[in-house]
């Protein structure tokens, strides 16, 4: 007997397909809007919060907030949109209460806000910086869509749904599943919640949806390209201005897009001279402002050329993690990160293993630190699943869309430590091709593993990459340093290599013999061998050791780690430096001095 014939069927109790209608994934890179420097109204603050371990909210339709039947008689209810416990947004729920520390599942956020139109025909958009992982949006009881991806922004238009008083509900689910990027098995903490800003934007009926401005990467340094997409208009004219260059140029809009090419020779952005220009674009009264640096990053043989000159990437890897804030960041915390990298003598940072806060690239533009940005195609995701690819590609495109105008971003990474299978090769090659097609101004890489049978840098994916990322842990997971030497000798890459990960765990302040694991002395010994390795092989053009700060991860539970990966050059307090910090610092300052002398 089917459900229609079953006379005691209760949909909210018996329908296990309840989630299908809420899984549209319609909030994606195509719905993102340009928000930089636009006026906004913050919806941050105290929200009502309810854990929903059984997904009752979707099953029973909590967004409908029904407390009376059709005859007006009162009904019992299991959820209070306006009476749940209060939680700050942005934040991670894991740090809110001890019992939420390892919670994975759905949770409902709710708050009211007032709205009064300020201009005729204005359009209103809700923008969320990030929510981990599946976020479903409800406004005044109506489902507007959902977004996959725990680290990228998303936008939804709410214009037609608003009244004077409005109820916004967001159901966030951080459950790890096999068909997503990342999948169930990772090596970082699975924070849940809305942990970046929630904002409203009021826009004109026709507005600039996206604007990309860059220096054409043809090695001539004299041509600026602007690609502009508009919404609410198919034709018209876009005006582009760069006042400091005395430039004003217009372009025609055709089918919602305009392309403008300007002959100009701007001062170039570099780590030594992080020059940024104000750029303005205008369409039918909608005027936006960008800060853009102009630079070129190219590969020539085994060398990386930045603005035409060979460069060595003196970097370090970083997780988005804080013992007190989780994945939420503050400007103070981020600026401390950049100060530590500068103190190291660094010019480069690898943002692992997912898109970090957009503030990172904004500050990097300002202070002159180059960035490697990555999507969480991590370890053994389901490379044969079309839905998994769609998820990964969308996260890549959202990241590129968000950070396209950031001069500091020089590398898009399409994954980390993935086995060299046929399915993975096809999956990640397509991602690399997508990145190159959408963004010709940057390089593409991935963090690859060593061929441990041949002791060689060998991965079929490298054919699709501009730079080879190499993750190796000789001295730690593989204690024989002779194998590190053989790896270097056996490898004959035709492209530049970055040692994207290497290192060792160490308890800050714990001392012992150089052979004793988890001691300062052992970590120093690993770094000395690794620095010597990098010096000896000229195809290595950079390194981002693992990593700047210790971070939380449930995989690491021995007596020393106690829930933390301890490979940080600085402890989880982000203050106490380990001795290996100074080993790397000495190497980087030497490289920096050599580069300065060669210019």
Task: Show which residues each predicted segment covers.
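Accessory beta-strand-rich segments of carbohydrate-active enzymes
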Residues: 3-5, 14-19, 28-29, 34, ...
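Accessory carbohydrate-binding/adhesion or oligomerization-edge regions at the termini
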Residues: 1-94, 171, 177, 528
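Intrinsic-disorder/low-complexity, polar/charged segments enriched in Ser/Thr/Lys/Arg/Asp/Glu/Gln
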Residues: 42, 106-112, 123-125, 153, ...
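Surface-exposed coil/turn segments at beta-strand junctions on protein surfaces, enriched
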Residues: 42, 102-104, 119, 149-151, ...
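Substrate-binding/catalytic cleft of secreted carbohydrate-active enzymes
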Residues: 225-227, 338-339, 348-590
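Active-site-adjacent substrate/metal-binding segments within catalytic domains
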Residues: 85-115, 119-139, 145-148, 180, ...
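Extended acidic/polar, glycine-enriched regions
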Residues: 161-165, 229-298
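Surface beta-strand/loop "capping" patches
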Residues: 205-232, 588-599
């Amino acid at each position: 007997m089917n459900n229609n014939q079953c006379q005691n069927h209760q949909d909210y109790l018996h329908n296990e397909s309840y989630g299908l209608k809420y899984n549209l994934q319609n909030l994606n890179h195509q719905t993102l809007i340009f928000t930089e420097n636009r006026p906004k109204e913050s919806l941050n603050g105290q929200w009502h919060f309810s854990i929903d371990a059984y997904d009752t909210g979707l099953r029973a339709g909590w967004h409908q907030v029904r407390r009376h039947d059709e005859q007006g008689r009162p009904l019992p209810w299991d959820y209070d949109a306006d009476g749940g416990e209060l939680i700050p947004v942005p934040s991670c729920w894991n740090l809110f209460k001890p019992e939420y520390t390892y919670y994975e599942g759905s949770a409902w956020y709710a708050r009211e806000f007032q709205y009064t139109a300020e201009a005729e025909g204005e359009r209103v958009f809700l923008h969320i910086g990030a929510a981990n992982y599946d976020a479903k949006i409800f406004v005044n009881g109506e489902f507007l869509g959902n977004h996959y991806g725990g680290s990228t922004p998303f936008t939804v238009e709410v214009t037609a749904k608003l009244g004077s008083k409005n109820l916004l509900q967001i159901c966030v689910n951080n459950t790890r599943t096999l068909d997503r990027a990342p999948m169930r098995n990772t090596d970082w903490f699975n924070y849940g919640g809305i942990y970046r800003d929630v904002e409203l934007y009021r826009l004109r009926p026709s507005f600039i949806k996206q604007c990309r401005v860059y220096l054409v990467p043809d090695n001539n340094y004299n041509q600026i390209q602007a690609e502009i997409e508009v919404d609410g208009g198919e034709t018209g004219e876009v005006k582009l201005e760069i006042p400091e260059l005395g430039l004003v140029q217009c372009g025609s809009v055709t089918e919602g897009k305009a392309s403008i090419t300007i002959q100009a020779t701007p001062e170039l952005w570099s780590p030594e001279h992080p020059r940024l220009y104000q750029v303005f674009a205008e369409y039918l009264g909608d005027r936006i402002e960008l800060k853009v640096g102009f630079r070129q990053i190219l590969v020539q043989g085994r060398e990386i050329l930045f603005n035409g000159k060979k460069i060595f990437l003196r970097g370090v890897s970083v997780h988005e993690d804080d013992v007190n804030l989780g994945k939420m960041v503050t400007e103070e915390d981020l600026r401390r990160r950049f100060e530590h990298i500068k103190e190291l003598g660094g010019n480069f940072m690898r943002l692992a293993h997912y898109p970090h806060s957009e503030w990172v690239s904004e500050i990097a533009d300002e202070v002159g630190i180059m960035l490697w940005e990555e999507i969480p195609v991590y370890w053994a995701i389901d490379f044969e699943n079309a839905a998994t690819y769609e998820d990964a590609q969308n996260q890549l495109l959202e990241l590129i869309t968000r950070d396209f105008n950031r001069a500091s971003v020089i590398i898009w990474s399409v994954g980390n430590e993935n086995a060299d299978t046929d399915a993975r090769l096809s999956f990640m090659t397509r991602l690399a091709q997508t990145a190159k097609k959408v963004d010709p101004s940057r390089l593409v890489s991935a963090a690859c593993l060593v061929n441990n049978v041949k002791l060689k840098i060998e991965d079929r994916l490298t054919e699709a990459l501009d730079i080879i990322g190499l993750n190796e842990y000789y001295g730690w997971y593989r204690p024989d340093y002779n194998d590190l030497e053989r790896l270097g000798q056996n490898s004959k890459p035709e492209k530049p290599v970055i040692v994207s990960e290497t290192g060792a765990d160490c308890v800050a302040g714990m001392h012992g013999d150089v052979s004793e694991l988890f001691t300062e002395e052992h970590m120093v010994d690993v770094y000395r061998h690794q620095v010597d390795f990098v010096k000896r092989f000229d195809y290595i053009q950079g390194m981002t050791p693992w990593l700047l700060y210790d971070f939380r991860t449930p995989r690491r539970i021995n007596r020393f780690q106690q829930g933390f990966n301890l490979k940080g050059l600085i402890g989880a307090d982000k203050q106490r430096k380990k001795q290996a910090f100074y080993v790397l610092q000495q190497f980087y300052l030497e490289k920096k001095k050599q580069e300065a002398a060669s210019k």
